A protein has these predicted regions:
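Intrinsic-disorder/low-complexity, polar/charged segments enriched in Ser/Thr/Lys/Arg/Asp/Glu/Gln
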Residues: 6-12, 19, 55, 74, ...
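A conserved amphipathic terminal alpha-helix motif
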Residues: 122-159
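Hydrophobic pocket/interface hotspot
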Residues: 22-26, 32, 56, 79, ...
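A short, structured loop/turn motif at beta-sheet edges
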Residues: 16-20, 47-51, 80-87, 107-116
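Hydrophobic/aromatic beta-strand elements that line small-molecule binding cavities or substrate pockets
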Residues: 11-13, 74-81, 92-94, 102-110
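Short, solvent-exposed aromatic-acidic interface loops
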Residues: 91-99, 120-127
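Glycine-rich portal/gate segments that line the openings of hydrophobic small-molecule binding cavities
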Residues: 44-93, 153-159
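Hydrophobic ligand-binding cavity/cleft-lining segments
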Residues: 1-52
Length: 159
């Protein structure tokens, strides 16, 4: 992955909770639905993940974004990085073949008073066909930032 600002977005927030409490939400398929700021994630099917290669299905509805007429569809989340209580990342497999190759993830750093959470979206590994499509990033920085706020609220309610 790259830190090139043109191919990666990162946002941070301090959450007054332990990395373990935050990671529990991030490794649970229902946690992904709970913290989604886009309104696209409707539900998820699968068990909490515990390793690279683990998968779960997310039931989506793109109508919330009002951008592409995709309707309801499913994607499979495939875990690409799993370092318990430190980092989790995933890519998406869905209707588009081969998969696009963009990656979503979180890093967790314990600090005084809680955890510094970094949410990132990286599209540095997408194919050339996708680079020219002009649709990346598919989510704005504001959506990542909003998701961190919802994650904060979700973790506080769970503890």
């Amino acid at each position: 992955m790259t830190n090139d600002a043109r191919e990666r977005i990162e946002v941070q927030r301090t959450i007054p909770a332990s990395p373990a409490a935050i990671f529990r939400v991030l490794s649970d398929p229902q946690g992904h639905v709970s913290i989604d700021s886009s309104g696209m994630l409707m539900d998820a099917t699968g068990e909490p993940v515990g390793a690279v290669g683990d998968r779960f299905v997310v039931h989506m509805d793109r109508e919330a974004l009002n951008d592409y007429p995709m309707g309801k569809y499913d994607v499979t989340v495939v875990i690409t990085t799993f370092d318990r209580d430190r980092e989790i990342a995933w890519t998406i497999e869905g209707q588009i073949k081969p998969p696009i190759g963009h990656v979503y993830g979180y890093t967790l750093e314990p600090i005084d008073g809680g955890t510094l959470v970094t949410s990132y979206y990286d599209w540095s590994s997408i194919g050339e066909d996708w680079r020219g499509a002009g649709i990346f990033p598919v989510i704005p920085e504001s959506a990542l930032r909003a998701t961190l706020g919802i994650l904060d609220r979700t973790v506080r309610r769970a503890t």
